[in-house]
């Protein structure tokens, strides 16, 4: 009995000590913006994750300066708003976006610790990850991958003819294609060309995309199925890419040579361990947003026939201008379009893509102030202290009616030269990143979307419908600005009808 009581006392004491530890609030710089009352003991301002835009609006409205402080577990975060603060947030060289991943519970990378591939050990402070991602998007490399990725796109849309209903949610079909092309552009043809391995890769990436462990920010030691699934996802990708790298290292001199990304990196003497880490991270990044956006763009064009017709005319014009035989079937002409044309000659797709990103990829961006000193917030005597996270919600600028009149309406023309109301403010559009951290994968992302839409529209006419194929002209944005992640119009269905002239 005495032993039982002693054990109970020890357990209760340990539990109370843990509660005291969790409830301890570290001191912060006195010039930090005022803390929001929207907080929960131990956890902090959890609405930052669960009610993203409502939380942000409420905090800004209650702040005299538009800036505010809040806790996420033990982490101090400063939310900033307005054009001047946005510019500092995006331009300050001490604001580290990679370490901002500490507060993001998605994907195969767990921060901290920060893997060596993300350390700025190269020229101009670039990391191995940044250096190789840029290298793989140089014209020489993308030119080598172009025949493969166009073949992937053509094959994916030709396969749709096997479905008699002609009804689909294009996000599902496009995701497999995006993963296949990503494997080819940032990893290995061995994955892209093997249906079984490609299916495994797609399955693991899908698991990671639909798993979030943001609760671990506040309670890092709490057992979590989500964290376990994320680690399992990282292990799953490692099991796919590691054997490929190892086989190449052990390959005999007279064996057939692969000309893909794995071989490119090995030929440059890259560390096999760093290569595997790079492939794991990049495959997830290259598939995540593109997997959603490509399907979403088909949804959008199906419900906007005027833009679909406009883009189709551009496709025919570009194909005829570059095809050896302008009288060949349109899909055959597409097979011969050079890289520079894929990149530069589809202005209507670019307008539609920017508007889709503006409306459906709006979220709080996070940076960590790595400077040994506080960073002043313009127009105030407030600061972002050293070692503190800063956050800016891109919804603020992307749905600002002064920059985007009638912001809830899909209107690609707002990005056309001669309008561009968003240029009234510096960094009025942040969809591709801005300042110190533009999107490093932007070049490939644009080329990839142009290729996918070109083959989709060359082969089929698309129209909106319900799940049973009944025509529908009502375009429901299905955008929840408070959602934990970007909310895209992926719940819509499309009907596709083969064109008479393909």
From Swiss-Prot:
Record's bilayer topology term: Single-pass membrane protein
Which GO CC annotations does the UniProt entry carry? membrane
Q: Which GO terms describe its biological process?
A: secondary metabolic process
| Pathway linked to the protein | Secondary metabolite biosynthesis
Which Pfam families does the UniProt record give?
Answer: p450 (PF00067)
Give the top-rank taxon of the lineage listed in the UniProt record for this protein: Eukaryota
Q: Which UniProt keywords apply?
A: Glycoprotein, Heme, Iron, Membrane, Metal-binding, Monooxygenase, Oxidoreductase, Transmembrane, Transmembrane helix
Positions annotated to bind heme: 439
Q: What is its main location?
A: membrane
**What are the recorded GO MF terms, alphabetically?**
heme binding; iron ion binding; monooxygenase activity; oxidoreductase activity, acting on paired donors, with incorporation or reduction of molecular oxygen
Query: What biotechnological purpose does this protein serve?
Result: Secalonic acids show unprecedented anticancer activities against various human cancer cells and might be interesting for further derivatization, targeting diseases such as cancer.
Q: Which residues cross the membrane?
A: 4-26
Q: Where in the cell is it found?
A: Membrane
Q: Which cofactor does it need?
A: heme
Residue positions the entry lists as glycosylated: 393
Please state the Enzyme Commission number of this protein. Answer: 1.14.13.-
Protein family (similarity comment): Belongs to the cytochrome P450 family.
Q: What does this protein do?
A: Cytochrome P450 monooxygenase; part of the gene cluster that mediates the biosynthesis of the tetrahydroxanthone dimer secalonic acid D. The pathway begins with the synthesis of atrochrysone thioester by the polyketide synthase AacuL. The atrochrysone carboxyl ACP thioesterase AacuM then breaks the thioester bond and releases the atrochrysone carboxylic acid from AacuL. Atrochrysone carboxylic acid is decarboxylated by the decarboxylase AacuI, and oxidized by the anthrone oxygenase AacuG to yield emodin. Emodin is then reduced to emodin hydroquinone by a yet unidentified oxidoreductase.
Q: What is this protein called?
A: Cytochrome P450 monooxygenase AacuE
């Amino acid at each position: 009995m005495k032993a039982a009581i002693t054990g109970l006392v020890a357990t209760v004491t340990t539990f109370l000590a843990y509660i005291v530890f969790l409830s301890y609030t570290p001191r912060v710089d006195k010039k930090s913006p005022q803390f929001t009352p929207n907080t929960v003991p131990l956890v902090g301002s959890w609405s930052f994750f669960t009610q993203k835009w409502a939380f942000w609006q409420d905090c800004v409205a209650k702040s005299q300066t538009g800036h505010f402080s809040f806790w996420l577990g033990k982490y101090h975060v400063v939310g900033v708003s307005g054009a001047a603060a946005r510019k500092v947030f995006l331009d300050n060289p001490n604001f580290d976006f990679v370490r901002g991943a500490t507060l993001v519970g998605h994907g195969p990378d767990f921060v901290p610790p920060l893997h060596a591939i993300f350390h700025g050990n190269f020229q101009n402070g670039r990391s191995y990850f940044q250096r190789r991602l840029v290298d793989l998007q140089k014209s020489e490399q993308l030119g080598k991958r172009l025949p493969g990725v166009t073949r992937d796109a053509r094959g994916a849309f030709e396969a749709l003819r096997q479905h008699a209903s002609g009804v689909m949610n294009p996000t599902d079909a496009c995701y497999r294609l995006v993963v296949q092309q990503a494997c080819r552009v940032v990893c290995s043809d061995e994955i892209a060309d093997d249906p079984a391995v490609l299916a495994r890769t797609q399955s693991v990436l899908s698991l990671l995309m639909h798993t979030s462990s943001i609760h671990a920010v506040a309670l890092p030691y709490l057992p979590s199925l989500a964290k376990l699934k994320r680690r399992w996802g990282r292990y799953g990708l490692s099991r796919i890419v590691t054997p490929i790298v190892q086989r190449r290292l052990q390959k005999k001199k007279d064996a057939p040579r692969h000309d893909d990304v794995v071989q490119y990196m090995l030929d440059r003497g890259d560390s096999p361990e760093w290569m595997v880490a790079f492939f794991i991270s990049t495959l997830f990044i290259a598939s995540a947003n593109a997997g959603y956006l490509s399907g979403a763009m088909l949804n959008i064009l199906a419900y906007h026939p005027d833009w679909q017709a406009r883009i189709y005319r551009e496709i025919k014009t570009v194909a005829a201008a570059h095809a050896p035989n302008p009288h060949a079937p349109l899909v055959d002409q597409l097979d011969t379009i050079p890289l520079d044309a894929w990149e530069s000659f589809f202005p209507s797709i670019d307008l539609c893509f920017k508007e889709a990103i503006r409306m459906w990829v709006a979220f709080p961006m996070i940076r960590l102030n790595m400077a040994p000193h506080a960073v002043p917030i313009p127009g105030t005597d407030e600061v972002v202290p050293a070692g503190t996270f800063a956050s800016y919600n891109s919804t603020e600028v992307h749905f600002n009616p002064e920059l985007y009149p009638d912001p809830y309406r899909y209107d690609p023309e707002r990005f056309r030269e001669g309008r561009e109301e968003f240029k009234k403010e510096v960094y009025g559009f942040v969809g591709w990143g801005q300042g110190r951290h533009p999107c490093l994968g932007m070049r490939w992302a644009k080329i990839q979307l142009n290729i996918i839409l070109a083959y989709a529209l060359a082969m089929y006419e698309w129209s909106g419908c319900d799940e049973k194929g009944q025509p529908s002209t009502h375009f429901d944005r299905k955008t929840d600005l408070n959602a934990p992640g970007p909310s895209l119009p992926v719940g819509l269905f499309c009907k596709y009808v083969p064109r008479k002239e393909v």
